[in-house]
């Protein structure tokens, strides 16, 4: 029997008198086939260390621990720590850290792996309410995670993996794809969770690029420009950029020159631009002193 078997999950929750906290976005997966697929998608073996976020009662952790060198799992809810000590008692390669992943010194914790030089993968069923902040925090941490295989709301997975000229494409697509390739591996129906969420989920596989997707003079400025370009999706690039940089004649003159230099029409919308085009635009705007 597995932790994720419905009868086992139910028994564990009852034995510990556990009640779900909506504020933590707790939805526990009760489908062993899907858990197996997640671990297979992540290609976990004994030459990999794993960071997990939000283990719940350890359903995914169990599958990871059977194959990984070590698993370090971060759980914000202190009530789950004794439950995890119970459900994962047979594993000596799992460390449970009762801290908020957004506040923890992750680089310091990683040094506690027995072999910290092994590749580190992030495999997790992320809390829906805080998926994007967690992802961006990890991606921008400077820690060289080799890949992420993470479950999230399908809509968010679609946005992250979206290509130009699609409805889902936006500043989040650019922010992630600058650092990583992103592809939806498979869909997870809402019916396999306790309690069932209101939406379907997706497993997103993201692999770190050896170098960022495009070369830019100023990364922070590049992200600001891409974000500003999607402020109002139905507005043109010109309208969004004047809304961000200002509408003085001097600014308009600089914008005109930058757009011309980048080979872009003022009437185009942000959703039509590729990462390379945003890079060219950001560098041209920077060159104009904006």
Curated annotation (Swiss-Prot):
InterPro entries linked to this entry: KsgA/Erm, rRNA_Ade_diMease-like_C, rRNA_Ade_Mease_Trfase_CS, rRNA_Ade_methylase_Trfase_N, rRNA_adenine_dimethylase, SAM-dependent_MTases_sf
- Does rRNA processing show up as a keyword for this record? yes
Listed GO molecular functions? 16S rRNA (adenine(1518)-N(6)/adenine(1519)-N(6))-dimethyltransferase activity; RNA binding
Q: Which reaction does it catalyse?
A: adenosine(1518)/adenosine(1519) in 16S rRNA + 4 S-adenosyl-L-methionine = N(6)-dimethyladenosine(1518)/N(6)-dimethyladenosine(1519) in 16S rRNA + 4 S-adenosyl-L-homocysteine + 4 H(+)
Q: Which CDD domains does the entry mention? A: AdoMet_MTases (cd02440)
Which Pfam family is an annotated match for this chain, by its short name? RrnaAD
**Where would you say this protein principally sits, based on its record?**
cytoplasm
SUPFAM superfamilies for this protein: S-adenosyl-L-methionine-dependent methyltransferases (SSF53335)
For this record, the Gene Ontology CC terms, alphabetical, are: cytosol
**Binding positions (S-adenosyl-L-methionine):** 27, 29, 54, 75, 100, 125
Enzyme Commission number(s) of this protein: 2.1.1.182
Subcellular localization, per the record? Answer: Cytoplasm
Q: What keywords would UniProt list here?
A: Cytoplasm, Methyltransferase, RNA-binding, rRNA processing, S-adenosyl-L-methionine, Transferase
In the record, the note on similarity to other proteins reads: Belongs to the class I-like SAM-binding methyltransferase superfamily. rRNA adenine N(6)-methyltransferase family. RsmA subfamily.
Q: Which PANTHER family match?
A: DIMETHYLADENOSINE TRANSFERASE, DIMETHYLADENOSINE TRANSFERASE-RELATED
Function of the molecule: Specifically dimethylates two adjacent adenosines (A1518 and A1519) in the loop of a conserved hairpin near the 3'-end of 16S rRNA in the 30S particle. May play a critical role in biogenesis of 30S subunits.
Annotated protein name in UniProt:
Ribosomal RNA small subunit methyltransferase A
Species assigned in the record = Streptococcus pneumoniae (strain CGSP14)
């Amino acid at each position: 029997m597995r932790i994720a078997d419905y009868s086992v999950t139910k028994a564990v929750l009852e034995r510990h008198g556990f009640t779900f906290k909506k504020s933590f976005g707790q939805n526990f997966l009760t489908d062993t086939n899907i858990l197996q697929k997640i671990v297979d998608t992540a290609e976990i073996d004994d030459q990999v260390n794993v960071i997990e976020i939000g283990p719940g009662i350890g359903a995914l952790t169990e599958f990871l621990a059977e194959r990984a060198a070590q698993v370090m799992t971060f759980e914000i809810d202190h009530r789950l720590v004794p439950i995890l000590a119970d459900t994962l008692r047979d594993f000596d390669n799992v460390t449970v850290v009762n801290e908020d992943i957004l506040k923890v010194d992750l680089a310091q914790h990683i040094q506690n792996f027995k072999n910290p030089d092994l590749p580190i993968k992030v495999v997790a069923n992320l809390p829906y309410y805080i998926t994007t902040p967690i992802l961006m925090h990890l991606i921008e941490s400077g820690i060289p995670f080799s890949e992420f295989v993470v479950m999230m709301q399908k809509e968010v997975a679609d946005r992250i993996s979206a290509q130009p000229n699609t409805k889902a494409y936006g500043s989040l697509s650019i922010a992630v794809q600058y650092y990583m390739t992103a592809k939806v591996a498979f869909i997870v129906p809402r019916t396999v969770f306790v309690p069932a969420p209101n939406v379907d989920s997706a497993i997103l596989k993201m692999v770190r690029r050896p170098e960022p997707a495009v070369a830019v003079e100023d990364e922070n400025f590049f992200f600001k420009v891409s974000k500003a370009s999607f402020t109002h999706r139905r507005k043109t690039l010109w309208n969004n950029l004047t809304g961000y940089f200002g509408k003085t004649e001097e600014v308009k003159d600089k914008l005109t020159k930058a757009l011309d230099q980048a080979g872009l029409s003022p009437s185009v919308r942000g959703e039509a631009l590729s990462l390379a085009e945003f890079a060219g635009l950001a560098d041209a705007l920077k060159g104009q002193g904006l």
